[in-house]
């Protein structure tokens, strides 16, 4: 790769927009490690790096031919309200890594100290997309369509888990499986011993038709994801970009 991508900063939606400040702190760290140039969304070109899909970033992604996307990590995620000392995922031309490929387990062991044994609870947990991802990915009827599909293969109760109601950490104890389009809450559930099914083509895992006998070979998936997330210091030092270019 000869040309470095432009790093796209976001613009605040209002005075004191903390999300904007966090986004730009992350992008500035990546730009430092890249040795590249930062621009605002309206100046973004065909090859970009950006954080999230809000504040102009999503529009820049849709216009780009190639993009590197930064967002919350898969495991040991950075707390947006804190010091940003956790992990962030970075992917090329996708919002998530597919989880495919063969990777060592050393980084997984670094971010996950204990994998809980397989749970066999009663409920199927549905984790819908956020309102922002729902709009960006055109997933407006995802819940209805997915529940209809689940009911073809299982008569188990289906609980909808959001950040406001039936939070994942509250319902995972009695879960048989978690079904989501792409939510990282499913990765948390997998670590806690619950099989997962992800329906998004970019990170497809498991099949709804197998929900009564779900896949649970989680080490390959978790190992792959652990190798595709980095810290703020990894970005700033250039380590993240070096590994992404391989």
Language model region names:
Residues 39-43, 55-56, 60, 148-152, ...:
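Donor nucleotide-activated moiety binding/catalytic core segment of transferases
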Residues 5, 36-38, 67-68, 124, ...:
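Hydrophobic anchor at the start of a short beta-strand
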Residues 8-13, 70-74, 121-133, 200-201:
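Short loop/turn segments at strand-loop or loop-helix junctions that form parts
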């Amino acid at each position: 790769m000869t040309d470095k991508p432009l790093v796209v900063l976001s613009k605040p939606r209002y005075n004191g927009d903390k999300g904007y400040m966090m986004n730009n702190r992350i992008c500035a760290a990546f730009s430092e490690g890249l040795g590249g140039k930062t621009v605002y969304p309206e100046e973004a070109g065909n090859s970009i790096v950006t954080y999230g899909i809000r504040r102009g970033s999503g529009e820049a992604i849709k216009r780009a031919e190639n993009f590197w996307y930064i967002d919350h990590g898969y495991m040991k995620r950075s707390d947006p309200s804190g010091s940003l000392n956790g992990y962030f995922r970075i992917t090329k031309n996708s919002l998530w890594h597919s989880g495919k490929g063969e990777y060592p387990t050393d980084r997984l062991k670094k971010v996950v100290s204990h994998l809980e044994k397989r749970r066999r609870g009663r409920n199927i947990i549905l984790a819908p997309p956020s309102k922002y991802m729902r709009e960006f990915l055109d997933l407006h009827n995802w819940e209805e369509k997915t529940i209809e599909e689940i009911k073809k293969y299982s008569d188990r109760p289906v609980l909808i888990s959001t950040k406001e109601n039936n939070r994942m950490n509250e319902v995972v104890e009695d879960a048989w499986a978690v079904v989501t389009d792409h939510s990282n809450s499913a990765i948390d559930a997998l670590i806690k011993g619950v099989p997962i099914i992800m329906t998004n083509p970019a990170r497809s895992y498991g099949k709804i038709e197998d929900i009564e006998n779900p896949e649970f070979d989680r080490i390959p998936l978790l190992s792959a994801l652990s190798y595709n997330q980095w810290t703020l210091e990894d970005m700033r030092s250039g380590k993240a970009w070096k590994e992404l270019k391989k």
